[in-house]
């Protein structure tokens, strides 16, 4: 004996209807958590049998169930997409039809695990079709792609995809995914026609015409481009030139052909190799019959246009790649080896006969394989047509099942109201989030000429992007919060234009003097060098004070241990204002030796590693006058000193610009004197002398070559040696040209 009533779940959902032995039985309504999501229909001992399930997004399923999953036959509405057909344990299949209500794009055939698999027919928004084999939601195996007339073909404007291939996937709630990132025609233009991939010219000619007057490659590259030119120039056909019949097998692009492509930049030529064929008749159609791999024309196949243009041979990623033969409308042929639509080997003069015969044999084998593949593809297309008709029959049965499910849902609502009159139903018996009106199916491509801009055919499920079609259990789907996005690292604090410096003193244990240096910072801030912290025992790290103060330099962050960590280099590259100039001075004084001096030397080398440094030499102040030599930069140097190796400034090599230009050497001025007066102390009985390091920091310049300092007499030798460099360059270029010509004529 069955009874019924209302049961409220802890998560906010409820069931109202009949039950038996503590399980839902008969007709009833079950809502999900917080009243979102609903199943209305018939039940059998706790499981759904026939009814309507509505997701919180508004997507619906109307049909049969088994063991809590969609199983049998039914109709799913997901956005503008509607699937009608069979279901197996929650997945689409085995036979079914999926179509877009907006533009008529659809797939009819076999399914497996929710993806197109087996044989089927895909119809695109412009009316073009594909019949053949499918694997994992992609065209793979053998098939036939038939386009509509060129004037009616969909215009694809998306820069990401350049043909209407198989229909792509979408989210579970019916919202559109981004288009497939992999282009169907790699390197083809942003504007093309659906189903048209065969071009009547070689892409190398596009390069030549676009690069006229903008030759930016070397002579060897120019020879390579000329070598790979094809005789199938569209401009040659348009002007009725007969150059493609020449012995060399190369066409001559006329001035009119250059004018056709004169508006296209060189960058576009190299990046996209755009196909421009304005003379294609609006009634021209194109058919490809052959092999497919990963949703693209790959393998052996035959592509033919209704105007007589035909290619038989090997393909790779929708391009002629391998050996093949091209037949033109006037009956002439071009055969050889192609690489990404470019003819790289064919009938040319001065070729060794044995080599030419080998190419001919490979071309013949490729043509035969393409013809065999075309025959198999036609057979597979016939099988796909039979699967399509069977799928349509299942779709009709699904419509009938959907109508029965709606009737069961109506009875379930009446039953629920009888058991619990207070049971409220909102929004057709459901409290859910009404989805926003979708204006697109799945595609951002648009379309046919002669009609306003409209959405192109959305694409069906694809491998790797197909959402889960699993049927929820007794309760509807729950929405899970997405994890927060990773917080980007804070940008380094910009250097203050008004620099503040503090003076720090250490001991030079080698010379027995103090070393003073100016450090950037404010009064009271922690020092940036870690050697001072080691003296304090390392109890206080620089990170705690400096990070809060925001005074860390962009290039380094120091730890209490004295080791440096590289910062983010990108802000330093974008910085436009030059950093302040640091000047470090050193005085020889009588003081005690300490290990702090050696640590300071290491720190100074680390701080100088990211800067280009101009280091002026030591100056010794003697009682008698000295001879001075003036360099080109205007800096004064003493010649009477016997410099020691360590006087070069803590192991940092002096660097000079080879060009000795004004950017590297700033002449001394009144505002910035080259020599500063510093108090000196006597060390025992030694003569008074002054040692000074003047370090000028500037950001590294990428374009300026750096070389060791040279004297004026060495400059004359450099001028004489550099005069022969252009001669050597010219000789090397001429030698390379000769080798290339020999290679082209005798070895290819």
From Swiss-Prot:
Basic and acidic residues: compositionally biased ranges: 639-649
- Segments in the Cytoplasmic topological domain: 1-727
Quick check: keyword Phosphoprotein in the entry? yes
Tell me the residues on which Phosphoserine occurs. 440, 457, 475, 506, 703, 710
The subcellular location is: Cell membrane; Endoplasmic reticulum membrane
The written remark on domains in the entry is: The MORN (membrane occupation and recognition nexus) repeats contribute to the plasma membrane binding, possibly by interacting with phospholipids.
Name of this chain's protein: Junctophilin-3
Native source species:
Homo sapiens
Q: Which gene encodes it?
A: JPH3
